[in-house]
C-alpha cells in the first residue's frame, strides 16, 4: 500500500533511501533525475520533501523549493523504475504544483519519455529549457593573449567578495545563479570536488578589479564541467568569456586521466549568444532539461 506525506526534515535513514532511489533511477535512465542542489538539501530544512512509500520502502521523492520574490516554486522528482506506470509521479507532481502556488515548475532532467508522459497527463507545458552541451577534451584551440589582464587561481575567502560582485552582476537575471551570497560559495567550497586550482580569475592589471572568472568541476577521471563562467557586464566585448572558458578547458584536459576525457556545461536554450559561442568551441547538445508548468 502506498502513502505520500510532506516532510520538512529527513532522517539519516530516509536520506540514504532517497540517495539509493536516485542512483537506481540514474542507472536505469542514463541521466540523474535531480540536480546537485537537491542532494545538498536532503540534510537541510530549507526546502520541503514529499515522500511516497510502498510497504515502508521509499519509491518516490520530490523536492520543492519555495517561491522567492519573482522566482516561482521549483520541484524536482524521482520515481523508482520498478514503481513507474502506477501514477505515482503524476500524483506527486500534482501535489507539488498545488502546494507551490502560481507558476510552480517541475524540472525533468533529460526530459525522458516517462517525464514527457507525466507532463502530458497533467497538461503541463515546457516553460524553460536547459541544454547540456559536451565536447571531447582533445584538439583544443590555443588560449588567446589577453593584454592588460592577469590570470590567477582562487587564493581563498579573500577573493569571495569580488567573485560575488561579478557573479551577481553577470547573472542578475538568472533564478538559480543570481543573488548569490557567501553562503553559496561556502557550500561549494565544502564539496569534495572543490579545487582552488580549478577556479580561474581574470583581473584588470591596472585597477586590480575582477573582470571575470571560470569555475571548473571534475566529476570523475573522464568527465569535467564548465561549472560557472561569469564576466562583469562592464567588461564584456573583450573576449574574456571565450578566453576564460579555454583556460578552464586546458586545465581539465591536463587533470583528467580517463581514456576519453570529456567536458560538459549547462546553458539556457534561449541564450543564443552563449549557445553559439559554445558551438564555436566545439560543444554540441548532449541532452535537454525541461521545466514544466501548468498551461
From Swiss-Prot:
This is Mycothiol acetyltransferase. It is an enzyme of class 2 (transferase). Catalyzes the transfer of acetyl from acetyl-CoA to desacetylmycothiol (Cys-GlcN-Ins) to form mycothiol. 1D-myo-inositol 2-(L-cysteinylamino)-2-deoxy-alpha-D-glucopyranoside binds at residues 36, 176, 217, 225, 266. InterPro entries: Acyl_CoA_acyltransferase, GNAT_dom, MshD_Acetyltransferase, Mycothiol_AcTrfase. One of its GO terms (molecular function) is protein-N-terminal-alanine acetyltransferase activity. Transmembrane segments: none annotated. CDD domains: NAT_SF (cd04301). Monomer. The gene is mshD. It comes from the Bacteria. Gene3D superfamilies: 3.40.630.30.
